[in-house]
Each structure stands twice: as C-alpha cells, then as structure tokens.
C-alpha cells in the first residue's frame, strides 16, 4: 500500500496549520497591544480616588497573596500599597504556611511571615489596618492558601459582619508580582459605568527580573510574556466580542438559535484562561463555585474552565503586571512541568463536567484541551520540523501538478519564515512598545549584535525548555505513577 498520498496530505495540513497559527499569533499580539495602549491613553478618564471614596457603589477589593519561602515579598506588598484606591476599600491578605514558620529556609534565615510582619511595622497606622496576615495550618498548595483566606470567619474578620459579596472582588497576586497602581480604579470604572463583569484577567509579563537575566533568559522572558499577550489575553478579547455577536444574532433570528449556538460552541468557542495572578473574581461568584478549585495542581486553569462551564465570560483587563521569570533553565523546566501536570489534572475535571452536562461547549472544551495541550505540548517541538521537512520532500512527488507543488513548497517555507519573523522579530518589537506602561521601568532593548542574533534565531529556546518540562512529567508518571510538582524557587539565583 502506497502511503505517499496520506503522508503528503498530513504534511500539507500540518504545515498549513503552522503558518496559519503564526499569523493568528501575530494578529493576537497586535490586538492585545492596541487594547493596552488605548486603556493607558485614557487613564485620566478613570474615576479619581476621591470620587471613589465618596461613591457607595465603588467595589471593595480583597487582594490575596499566597506566599511560601518568598524573600522579596516586601516588593509585592509595596506595589499593592502604592495603588490609587481608597484605603477603606482595599484589604491585602498575605497567606503563608505554618510549616515554614516552624522551619524557615536556611538561605532566608526567617520565614516569609516574619518579613510580612516587619513590612507591616514600617507602614503608617492607616495602612497597617489594610494589611492582614493568615497562616495555613496544614499541608496545601496555592489553592488551599487562597481558600484559607476565604473562610466565612476570616471574611467576617477582614470585611466586617455585614459585607455584601456582590460588591467585593477577590484579587490574586503571586509573591513576585508587581501590579499597576491603577488596576483597582480601572475595574471600579467598569463597574460604575455599567460595563461590569464577574471576573477579570489582566495582562501579565514575565519581565520583572529582566535585567538580571542572561541572553538566553531574556529570550525566554520575552517568549513567555508573548504567550500571555498573543494567546491568553487576545483570546479573552476576541471571545468576548464573538460571544456577544452570536448572542445578538440569536436574538434577531431566534429560529436559528437552537442550531447556531451549539454549532458556535462546538467549532468556534475557545477555552478561557485564568493566569493565577492579576486576576479578579467577584466574591459571590467565587463562593457559588465553592471557592478556588483544589482538584489539580494549577487552580487558575481549572477556575477558567469552571467559569466557562457556567457561562461566565472573563473580561480582559488592560492593566499590566510584572512577574519574575525563573532565572535558570532548570527552573523554567520545573515551572513548565508544574503547568503541564495541571493540564493533565484538568482532563479529569473536563471529563466529569461533560458527563454531568453533555453540551456542545463542554465537549469542545474537553477535545480542544486534550488535542491542543495534552497531546501537542510535548510533541510540537519535534513534530513541526519533521513535518516541514516531509512537506518539502513530498512536494516533488507532485511536481507535475503545478499549483499543488507550489503550495506544498510554500506552506513549510512560510511557516519557517514566520517562525523567525513573528517569534524572533515582531514579538520583541511589540513587547518593547509596552515599556512606557510597565509598573516599573525595564529596558527591553537588544543592545548588542549577539543579543539581536540569538534573540532572532534562537527564539524557540523557551519552547524547547517547555517541552522538556512536559516530558519530565510524562516520564515520571510512566516510571513512578506520579509526579510531585515543585514550587518555583525564588531564593537561590
């Protein structure tokens, strides 16, 4: 049996998809950059701190910072307390672990909780009332720490006995986060302007420690940041628009709604992405979900799926946040291994969700998650180069068919060119355009020929490390039947 036609068709489709995906990524970056620039250009139209102080409708923010072995927690807290928002409507809660207090990391000398207490003593009296510290008594990851702060007794202690959950937003920052000081004002402006949402996800960039990184680390920082702007936020922007368009279409043609809506959910809906920081969910919505999910390693991705399954759209938020990139290749691999383990954990959640409610949307989420994340993540770095070469090779089998021959050569060539152009050149230029809006000045320019050369032609460095992370999980599961993800180490350099 001659498999040449089948292999040719597979290579043709894969190369076409690769080229199309890179073009979509390019468009996604442009969409997000435009979204951010427009918002920062209109900051003067946001409600002032004084106006929010006098407006009883202004939301209250309960900002949670889960922390464990975090030597630079004071920097994150300083960023949060620099926010332009009424003091009485902002509560910052740091949740540490009792086990760390009993046995601090030797390189730190003191526990994170002690660093929080020291920071609190340096605050003026009014600010001390805004900062709370809780300690998780038993074992648990980030989700358990967050949920410890959302216990009814903790909420009553922090917010008072008569708080309204529908007017409280729960924000989440990691202990290395540096938020924009206007993030609360932006959300308040949307809420007071009648454009409110139950959940918001802001733009996060892994550039906080950019100047400390070497060339390889800077390439990875730019590439990891690009994921958030070209995929995560761009998808939320477009999803919001598309869903609203289909809703208007169904309202105008109700007879088509029973067919149109399921078809749209099955073929065109995308997964909603929560990033786990620079993220805000209204308290009553979060309580209706049973607070943060603890079934998997990555509570943020599961939360995004839970919100989507309930028909809740996450609103994209243009305010920027800086976080650290793990500073060694091994740490990047471990970070991606933890994320991939979360991807595997989400399969069981999506399967249960679909069995419980077998809708077109839930089926699409399960299938796309398995195909685009579980399967593609560990193999993409190897499959696409092989398929590209195969496409070039098999094109000559059909050289007598002019158009087929031309397109067969063109798609892998275009995909390769776009990999360098979009991944190595456009991504750098567009992220540099965000520099004026960062919460802290960061010089993102490539200054030497070596930086420019390697940044252009080694733009796949980060993806190779991410692939190693996925295979580390798969190998551990095959060998030991389990994988225990490690926390990102921010102590050693």
Indicate where each model-derived feature is located.
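Short, acidic, metal-binding catalytic loop of nucleotide-sugar glycosyltransferases
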Residues: 78-89, 99
